[in-house]
């Protein structure tokens, strides 16, 4: 069965194991998520569990949103997402960090940091031209392709907006779970800025 929870990225730090090994970790705060709706094949065409995370003031919610969360007897939520392959939960149930334990392998999803409009060197890692000796080619995109088509092909790597994409990092290891603080420590880095929404769920490609 899949495990899943929504959380907020706090930042990065480091811990040491008993053997003295140094491990960089990302701190993710995941206060209890509330099950708002259980979707079934009969009513919705597919099976999923809809959960809400991070309370917000009622004045910021409209009537339909208030009615939706009232069924779960909870406050309006800032973030609402779905998890599939989670069974045995009812509306109003809570998902906490205690479902995970050290050593679990998870997939972590977030929105990468936006970098704005960037050139091909920063955006795609293209090599630059000579910077001196009369060169007139420094940081330009280079060849646009052959002459014959009389056009630039789709997907040509050019300058443009960079970052701000939905990114999933697979097979990250949970180093430690701290239930009293609703915190999960994940080995390595995860996408997104501080305070951004993070989705943690069981890895789909984990070694069995």
Swiss-Prot record:
| Keyword presence, Ribosomal protein | yes
Entry's Gene Ontology molecular function annotations:
rRNA binding; structural constituent of ribosome
Chain intervals for the UniProt region annotation (Disordered): 122-148
Q: Which UniProt keywords apply?
A: Ribonucleoprotein, Ribosomal protein, RNA-binding, rRNA-binding
Name one process (GO BP) from the record.
Answer: translation
Report if keyword Repeat is assigned: no
Q: Name one GO cellular component term.
A: cytosolic large ribosomal subunit
Gene3D superfamilies to which the protein is assigned, alphabetical? 3.30.160.810, Translation factors
Its biological purpose = One of the primary rRNA binding proteins, it binds directly near the 3'-end of the 23S rRNA, where it nucleates assembly of the 50S subunit.
What is annotated about its quaternary structure and interactions?
A: Part of the 50S ribosomal subunit. Forms a cluster with proteins L14 and L19.
Give the similarity note.
Belongs to the universal ribosomal protein uL3 family.
Question: This chain belongs to which protein, by name?
Answer: Large ribosomal subunit protein uL3
**UniProt gene name:** rplC
């Amino acid at each position: 069965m899949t495990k899943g929870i929504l959380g907020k990225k706090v930042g990065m730090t480091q811990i040491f194991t008993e053997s003295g090994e140094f491990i960089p970790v990302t701190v993710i705060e995941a206060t209890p998520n509330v099950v708002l709706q259980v979707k079934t094949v009969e009513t919705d065409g597919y099976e999923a569990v809809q959960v809400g995370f991070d309370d917000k003031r009622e004045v910021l919610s409209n009537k339909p949103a208030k009615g939706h969360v009232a069924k779960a007897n909870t406050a309006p939520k800032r973030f609402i997402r779905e998890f599939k392959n989670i069974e045995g939960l009812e509306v109003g149930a809570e998902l906490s960090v205690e479902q995970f334990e050290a050593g679990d392998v998870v997939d972590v999803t977030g929105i990468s940091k936006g970098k704005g409009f960037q050139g091909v060197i920063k955006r795609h890692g293209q090599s630059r031209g000579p910077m001196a000796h009369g060169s007139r080619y420094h940081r330009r995109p280079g060849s646009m392709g052959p002459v014959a088509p009389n056009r630039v092909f789709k997907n040509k790597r050019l300058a443009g907006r960079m970052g701000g994409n939905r990114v999933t990092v697979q097979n990250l290891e949970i180093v430690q779970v701290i239930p009293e603080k609703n915190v999960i420590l994940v080995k390595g880095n995860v996408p997104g800025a501080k305070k951004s929404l993070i989705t943690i769920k069981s890895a789909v490609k984990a070694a069995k």
